[in-house]
C-alpha cells in the first residue's frame, strides 16, 4: 500500500535529486585538470615554447574554456522558472538532464577545435544551471520542515562529492595515452546525468505544484506516502488544507510576473537571495576549485594533481558537517562566523603568498607553500560547512510558492554570473597581481558576514508558510533567532478577525513567542495581496 513508502521516499529523493549537484561538481572539478593535460594542450593550446617543449593556453582561452559553462548556467537558471511553472519541477529536471547529457556527448566527440568544446560547455551549462534551481526547489517543497535544511544540504554534499571524484579521475587519467587522458575524464560525466534522469522517473511531483495545478487528490496521496499515513488521517488532511489555503491566498493576485518579484511585499527577499548567492561566489571558493591545479603549481607544489585532490577531499568531507551545523545552529550564525573565518584564512593565504613564497633568487619557499595549502584547507573547512550549503538553503526556503520559481531563478542567476566573472577573469588577475588577489576575497567574505547579520532572518525549523509570515513581520534580523513564530495561533487570529467581518489586507497581529521569555510580545504587520 502507498502509505508504507514514506521512509524510503525521503532517502530516494535525497539520492536522485541531489545527483543534479553531482553533475555540477563533476564539471567544476574536472575542468582545471583537463585543461592542464598534455594531449589536451597539444590539440587546443594557442601557445608553444620550443625551449621547454610545453604547450599552454592563453589567459583568454583558459578563461573561456573554464567560464563558458557558467554563461550557459546563467541562461539555464533563468529559463528554468517558466518551464517549471508549466511542466512542474519533476518533468523539468528530466528534460534538463537530457540537455546536460547532449552537452557532454558533444565535448567528448570534439574535433580539433577548441570552439566546439566551448560551445558544448555552454550547452552543458544550460542543464547544470537549470538543475541548480530545480533540484533544491524540489527538495524544499517536498521535505518535512524538521529535516528540510539537511535535505537541501545534500545537494551541496553531492556538488562536493562530484568535485572530489572528478579530481580523483583526473589523477588517474592524466597519464593515459593521447585523447583518453581527457575524453575519459569528461565522458564519465554522462553516467551522472543518466542516473539522475532515470532516478527522478520514480519520484512524484511536489504536492505544492500538484495543488497549484488542481491535482489535489494526487497531492494528498503524495503527502500520505511521505508521512506514512493514510490519506484521510488528520495529519495529512491538516497539511493538505494548510498548503491549499496558503497557495490559494498567494495566487489570488493572479499569475506572477518577473516585475512582481520586485514588488514591495517580496523585493526584500528577492535582493537578499541575490546578495547571498553572489557573495557565495565572492567568497573565493572557485578560485581553488577551478584553478586549484594552477594555484598549487604557483605555490611550488610538485604534485598539483594530488594537492588539488586533497583540497577537494577536505571540501567533500567537511560538507557532512554542514548537514549538522545548519540544523543545530541555524542559518544566520554559521554564515556570519563562516564569513569571518574565511576572511582570516584568505588574508593569511595572500599575505604569505605575496610576501614569503619566493626567495630573492626566484626559487619557491616550500614552508611558505605548505602554509598556503593549510590556509586553503582551513578556508574550505569553513566554507563547506557554512556558505556552501546555507546559501542554497536560504534560497530554497525563503520565498512564497507564488514567487518561488522566479525568485530562485534570479538569485541563482546572480550566482552563475559571478561564477563566470571569477572563472574568466581569474587568469588575467592572477597574472597581474599574483596572490594579492586573495585580499579581494578576504574583503568579500567579511562583507558577506555583515550582510547576513543585517538582513537575513533565522528560519531554522519553520515551515515555508511560517517563514513567509516571519519575513512579513517587523522582527529585526538579529532578533529573529529568539522567536518561534506560532503559525497556528496567528491563523486563529486571522480567522477570528475574518469572522467578525474584518476585510482582507487589514492589519494583523502576529503572535510570536520568545523562546527565552515568559511574555508574548505582539508585532503588527500589513499582510497585503501579492500583486
Curated annotation (Swiss-Prot):
Protein name in the entry: High-affinity glucose transporter ght2
UniProt keyword annotations, A-Z: Glycoprotein, Membrane, Phosphoprotein, Sugar transport, Transmembrane, Transmembrane helix, Transport
Pfam family, one: Sugar_tr
Entry annotated with the keyword Oxidoreductase: no
Region (Disordered): 491-531
An example molecular function term from Gene Ontology annotations: carbohydrate:proton symporter activity
Top-level taxon in the UniProt lineage: Eukaryota
Keyword NADP assigned: no
Membrane-spanning parts: 14-34, 63-83, 92-112, 117-137, 149-169, 184-204, 271-289, 306-326, 333-353, 368-388, 409-429, 437-457
Lineage summary: Eukaryota, Fungi, Dikarya, Ascomycota, Taphrinomycotina
Job description of the protein: High-affinity glucose transporter.
Extracellular side: 35-62, 113-116, 170-183, 290-305, 354-367, 430-436
Chain positions with Phosphotyrosine modification: 523
Amino acid at each position: 500500500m502507498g502509505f508504507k513508502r514514506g521512509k524510503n521516499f525521503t532517502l530516494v529523493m535525497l539520492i536522485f535529486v541531489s545527483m543534479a549537484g553531482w553533475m555540477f561538481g563533476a564539471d567544476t572539478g574536472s575542468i582545471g585538470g583537463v585543461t592542464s593535460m598534455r594531449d589536451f594542450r597539444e590539440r587546443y593550446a594557442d601557445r608553444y615554447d620550443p625551449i621547454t617543449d610545453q604547450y599552454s593556453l592563453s589567459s583568454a582561452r583558459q578563461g573561456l574554456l573554464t567560464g563558458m559553462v557558467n554563461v550557459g548556467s546563467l541562461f539555464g537558471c533563468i529559463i528554468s522558472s517558466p518551464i517549471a511553472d508549466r511542466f512542474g519541477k519533476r518533468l523539468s529536471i528530466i528534460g534538463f538532464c537530457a540537455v546536460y547529457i547532449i552537452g557532454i556527448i558533444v565535448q567528448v566527440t570534439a574535433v580539433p577545435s577548441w570552439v566546439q568544446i566551448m560551445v558544448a560547455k555552454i550547452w552543458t551549462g544550460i542543464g547544470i544551471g537549470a538543475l541548480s534551481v530545480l533540484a533544491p526547489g524540489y527538495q524544499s517543497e517536498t521535505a518535512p520542515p524538521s529535516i528540510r535544511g539537511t535535505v537541501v544540504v545534500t545537494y551541496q554534499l553531492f556538488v562536493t562529492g562530484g568535485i572530489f571524484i572528478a579530481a580523483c579521475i583526473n589523477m588517474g587519467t592524466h597519464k593515459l595515452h593521447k585523447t583518453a587522458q581527457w575524453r575519459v575524464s569528461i565522458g564519465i560525466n554522462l553516467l551522472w546525468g543518466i542516473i539522475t534522469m532515470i532516478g527522478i522517473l520514480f519520484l512524484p511531483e511536489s504536492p505544492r505544484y500538484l495543488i497549484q495545478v488542481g491535482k489535489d487528490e494526487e497531492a494528498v496521496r503524495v503527502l500520505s506516502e511521505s508521512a506514512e499515513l493514510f490519506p484521510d488521517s488528520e495529519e495529512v488532511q491538516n497539511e493538505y488544507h494548510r498548503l491549499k489555503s496558503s497557495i490559494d491566498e498567494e495566487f489570488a493576485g493572479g499569475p506572477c510576473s518577473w516585475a512582481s518579484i520586485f514588488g514591495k511585499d517580496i523585493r526584500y527577499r528577492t535582493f537578499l537571495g541575490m546578495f547571498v548567492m553572489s557573495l557565495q561566489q565572492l567568497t573565493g571558493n572557485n578560485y581553488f576549485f577551478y584553478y586549484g591545479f594552477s594555484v598549487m603549481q604557483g605555490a611550488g607544489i610538485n604534485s598539483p594533481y594530488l594537492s588539488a585532490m586533497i583540497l577537494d577531499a577536505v571540501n567533500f568531507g567537511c560538507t557532512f558537517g554542514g548537514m549538522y551545523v545548519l540544523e543545530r545552529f541555524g542559518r544566520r550564525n554559521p554564515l556570519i562566523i563562516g564569513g569571518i573565518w574565511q576572511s582570516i584564512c584568505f588574508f593569511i593565504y595572500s599575505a604569505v603568498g605575496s610576501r614569503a613564497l619566493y626567495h630573492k633568487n626566484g626559487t619557491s619557499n616550500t614552508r611558505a607553500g605548505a602554509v598556503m595549502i593549510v590556509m586553503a584547507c582551513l578556508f574550505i573547512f569553513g566554507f563547506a560547512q557554512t556558505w556552501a550549503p546555507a546559501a542554497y538553503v536560504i534560497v530554497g526556503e525563503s520565498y512564497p510558492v507564488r514567487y518561488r520559481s522566479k525568485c530562485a531563478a534570479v538569485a541563482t542567476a546572480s550566482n552563475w554570473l559571478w561564477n563566470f566573472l571569477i572563472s574568466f577573469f581569474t587568469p588575467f588577475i592572477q597574472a597581474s597581481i599574483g596572490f594579492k588577489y586573495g585580499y579581494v576575497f578576504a574583503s568579500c567574505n567579511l562583507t558577506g558576514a555583515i550582510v547576513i547579520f543585517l538582513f537575513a532572518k533565522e528560519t531554522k525549523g519553520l515551515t515555508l508558510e511560517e517563514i513567509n509570515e516571519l519575513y512579513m513581520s517587523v522582527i529585526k534580523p538579529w532578533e529573529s533567532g529568539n522567536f518561534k513564530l506560532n503559525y497556528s495561533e496567528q491563523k486563529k487570529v486571522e480567522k477570528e478577525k475574518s469572522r467578525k467581518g474584518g476585510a482582507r489586507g487589514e492589519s494583523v497581529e502576529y503572535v510570536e513567542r520568545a523562546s527565552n521569555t515568559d511574555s508574548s510580545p505582539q508585532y503588527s504587520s500589513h499582510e497585503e495581496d501579492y500583486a
